[in-house]
From Swiss-Prot:
GO terms for cellular component: extracellular region; nematocyst. Disulfide bonds join 35-50, 44-61, 63-72. Has both toxic and EGF activity. Its EGF activity consists of rounding cells (morphological change) and inducing tyrosine phosphorylation of the EGFR in A431 cells, but with a lower potency that human EGF. Its main location: secreted. It comes from the Eukaryota. Residues 1-23 form the signal peptide. It comes from Anemonia viridis (Snakelocks anemone). This is U-actitoxin-Avd12a.
Length: 77
């Protein structure tokens, strides 16, 4: 019984300390979560929308209109 109790407590600790066990303002989906602070204001160019993918720790942009690129820096022709 003591072994079971110890294993249960270890499992709870893993869940509480993992990223998946943490709560965020917005649930992550395929497009990540909205950027905050300086990234929200200046990471994307040409009116793009900044997103953050928590699982890989990367920022990217959803571009508007005729722009492409990681930060919406390229105009399509």
């Amino acid at each position: 019984m003591a072994l079971f109790r110890m294993l249960f407590l270890c499992a709870v600790l893993v869940l509480l300390t993992s990223k998946e066990g943490m709560s965020y303002e917005e649930p992550e989906n395929d497009e990540g979560v909205a950027c905050t602070g300086q990234y929200a204001e200046s990471f994307c160019l040409n009116g793009g929308t900044c997103r953050y993918i928590q699982s890989i720790g990367e920022y990217y942009c959803i571009c508007n209109g005729d722009y492409t690129g990681h930060r919406c820096e390229k105009k399509q022709v």
